[in-house]
Amino acid sequence: MHRVMTIHPDIAPPPDLPAPAEPPAKVSPMMEQYHEIKAANPGLLLFYRMGDFYELFFEDAEIASRALGITLTKRGKHQGMDIPMCGVPVERSDDYLHRLIALGHRVAVCEQTEDPAAARARKSVVRRDVVRLITPGTLTEDTLLDARANNYLLAIARARGSSGTDRIGLAWIDISTGEFSVTECATGELSATLARINPNEAIVSDALYSDAELGPSLRELAAVTPLTRDVFDSATAERRLCDYFAVATMDGLAALSRLEAAAAAACVTYVDRTQLGKRPPLSPPSREATGATMAIDPATRANLELTRTLAGERRGSLLDAIDCTVTAAGSRLLAQRLAAPLTDAAAIARRLDAVEVFVVAPALREQIRSALRAAPDMARALARLSLGRGGPRDLASLRDGIVAADQGLQQLSQLTAPPQEIAAAMAALRRPSRDLCDELGRALADDLPLQKRDGGFVRDGYEAALDETRKLRDASRLVVAAMQARYADDTGVKGLKIRHNNVLGYFVEVTAQHGDRLMAPPLNATFIHRQTLAGQVRFTTAELGEIEAKIANAGDRALGLELEIFDRLAALIETAGEDLRAAAHAFALLDVATALAKLASDDNYVRPEVDQSLSFAIEGGRHPVVEQALKRAGEPFIANACDLSPGPAQASGQIWLLTGPNMAGKSTFLRQNALIALLAQTGSYVPAARARIGIVDRLFSRVGAADDLARGRSTFMVEMVETAAILNQATERALVILDEIGRGTATFDGLSIAWAAIEHLHEQNRCRALFATHYHELTALSAKLPRLFNATVRVKEWRGEVVFLHEVLPGSADRSYGIQVAKLAGLPASVVARAKSVLAKLEANDRGQPKALIDDLPLFAITARAPAEPSPPSEAEQLIAAVQALHPDELSPREALDALYALKAKLPKTT
């Protein structure tokens, strides 16, 4: 279920999220502060910092306890009722945030903004404020992100046109990498565009959210946030964009349409609000021209299992099968390309040129991949540092990235004439400053903490003042160690320890059995009781308090100096941000090129010819996912050809009508040709012996069966809706694959629909298409439609058994072998026998006489008949049984020879 977040004061919280509870007339200062902060952030779960915990109250606590499976307790009273409360440790908060975000919740993180000691001195509650709004589309932490997937925030703006010609502007950003894109489309193309972008969160105007036409489909997105209309105001869009990018005019940015600018401005406005004024570095918006990528509707993406299987898993998808990348950034770029295949033959050729370099030079390929393995995720490290969320390891990531850039350049220098994409990548790798790398190398210690607040990340000897402060701190700690030994001697408690935590500070700890000794005279004059636990008793001393103050002061000074150094290094990195981002993109590009080259070499893929023709000629085509599965099982994949190119004197592509039995491989053949076209336009080599493909502008797939009960649609209705979309939208350049159209209704209805659909594809759409069917009557259309070609999947029948050969040949099938497949599936023998009887009767009757057929066929006499006898075993089954009955270890040589002759005698006689 989607959830709606409102962060604008003009919009009331939606009904499915809790409104802030009204504060009573008299509450504690802490709860008064909580109510004030909660009222300013409606529609979000408030993580309210209390010491080492984030605590949630009222409805927030009830929601979080259910979502996270944590205990719901209570804290004080509100209007005479217990206040529900739950909490999570600060140090483990990322785990809990990840689970809440994955469930569609939004969170406001409220931190303590002063030291509790300062609040006590003021005799007031600790100051707190919201420092971050966490929403599904604005994540930056590695712990909250999928390393191999982009995390997009999408803004959608609409412009009303006359006669229903509305236009949609879209802008999407990934603040974790800085990517920023815009495009414009018609309302009819919105669903395909949304499926391609696959946003983690979408923002729309409240009017669009409530729109009768588009609202329902928008609300199906994983997370959608309605905002006030002014956020999408095109009149102020340019000013807001110029302000964000700190430029005087839009001249330096892409030439955006008014609608694209409105969506782009909405994006940066939302980022400003959720990041509370901290601006992540974004690339200037890149404008995607209309028609620049292959249009693929949501149903086709799902049916072809491009990035996820129908079960929602990455494993088993096309992306999983072809992803040989070694970096997270490379995996993200490959997924982007697979989601948006190009329609520009020249741009595709440039990508293929980059892959070919590493196909023909396997040694260089492996050298580059080795260098890439050392390249960290620089883009995301940069984003975290710019937002103040980075840590020492992010600094190290950028240092290591520059080192990897040098290694990559050294290897790529072997190329005397690198193709355009590789040359551009090499230029980008030269951009980062080597002086910056040296500075980071001098500053950073070898063993780095995750958080900068933990300290210890600056190398000894980097800064003299820090070294001196550390010596003072460490000397005080040696005093504590000596004090522990002295206290143990004075008390006679050899197990006495001096420990530290954030609540008590330094304290003396003994086991429970020794606690009474320290609380009794004369030791109680020195040891002051602080806390009793189940197995330990804790004390402090005046001397320990003095030492703690010295250690704290020295430690605080050391940490303060380290944080100053961190900020100084982060500022240097921000200055070099554009160069570092360019290098990060170059790493991703090289990773994709080398990964696709490895795939091509390992799996025997070939470079496709992609041009502006209407050709579609595949020789020895294979299904990339099925082939890998069969290879793991030690079985071969049967390759097949497919030629949908226009024939002599024909201006349009062909339609193949494919017949054959179930389980013969028709659906695999259909899908593999669609995937080959998609891979070719992605810029990948393809699983074939040869492939020539004229640009496909739209890809349609109507394969498989599924209902849509939520919308009240039956399986047949879903099939018809998808078929209607194909027949209404397919262009001459489209590639269409259709499987079993018309199967979900009465035979003659289904046959009629399939018949008419083929005629429409041939005469109106005039596109390249593959049409699989069990309606063998349709093969007669080839005599009437000149571009319709009959093909069949070859099978062999042997003594009542059917053998699937998976070979596609010219011709047509006259049988579907459904009963044989049913037998293989394990249907009871009596059912199989009865099915054969019914089939014989059906085939003997005139199918044009349904009344006579029904009267003649005793379908309702089953209950009056004796159960059918199981069919006798076939000769093949008898032969298998005879072999299974043999026990070779128990046979003498003579008996074994006799058994062999007996088996030979059972073989069917052949002429």
Curated annotation (Swiss-Prot):
Keywords: ATP-binding, DNA damage, DNA repair, DNA-binding, Nucleotide-binding. GO terms for biological process: mismatch repair. The keyword Cytoplasm does not apply. It comes from the Bacteria. InterPro entries: DNA_mismatch_repair_MutS (IPR005748), DNA_mismatch_repair_MutS-lik_N (IPR007695), DNA_mismatch_repair_MutS/MSH (IPR017261), DNA_mismatch_repair_MutS_C (IPR000432), DNA_mismatch_repair_MutS_clamp (IPR007861), DNA_mismatch_repair_MutS_core (IPR007696), DNA_mismatch_repair_MutS_N (IPR016151), DNA_mismatch_repair_MutS_sf (IPR036187). One of its GO terms (molecular function) is ATP binding. PROSITE patterns: DNA_MISMATCH_REPAIR_2. GO terms for cellular component: cytosol. This is DNA mismatch repair protein MutS. It comes from Rhodopseudomonas palustris (strain HaA2). The gene is mutS.
